[in-house]
């Protein structure tokens, strides 16, 4: 897959990775870091707050990279404090709201997201501004 990632990078396209889930080694944050080490300024999205059920590994492995995270399939599994820890680690400017629809109800995911207690400006960034910037929709 490395040639695909290199071409996406050459074209300025971010790639979304399913990250986490300790039931398999295929999607660990470490695996994503292996790609980033080969393409150092690679822009990608690590789904599920960087690594479903492997959030500490995600924060350790993916620090200092151009990784964005999303909130999909995670907010039901962590406390608001744990979610905030990951969001603040990667930065509000590198976090995007996600639902993993149709697996989860968008309405319930939004309720969980708003329960995190961020202010209007941060919510606006995570709900759409970061996505628009990353995918150059605002240009």
Language-model-detected regions and their locations in the chain:
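Conserved, mostly hydrophobic/aromatic
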Residues: 8, 48, 69, 100, ...
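Short, solvent-exposed coil/turn elements at secondary-structure transition points
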Residues: 50-52, 75, 101, 119, ...
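Catalytic pocket-lining loop regions of alpha/beta-barrel enzymes
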Residues: 1-96
């Amino acid at each position: 897959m490395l040639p695909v990632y290199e071409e996406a990078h050459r074209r300025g396209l971010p790639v979304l990775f399913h990250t986490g889930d300790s039931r398999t080694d295929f999607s660990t944050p470490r695996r994503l870091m292996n790609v980033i080490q080969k393409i150092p300024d690679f822009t990608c999205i690590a789904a599920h707050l960087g690594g479903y059920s492997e959030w500490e590994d995600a924060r350790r492995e993916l620090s200092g990279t151009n990784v964005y995270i999303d909130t999909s399939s995670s907010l039901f599994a962590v406390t608001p404090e744990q979610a905030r820890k990951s969001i603040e680690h990667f930065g509000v400017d590198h976090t995007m709201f996600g639902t993993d629809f149709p697996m989860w109800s968008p309405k319930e995911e939004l309720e969980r997201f708003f329960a995190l207690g961020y202010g209007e400006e941060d919510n606006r960034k995570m709900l759409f501004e970061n996505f628009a910037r990353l995918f150059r929709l605002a240009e």
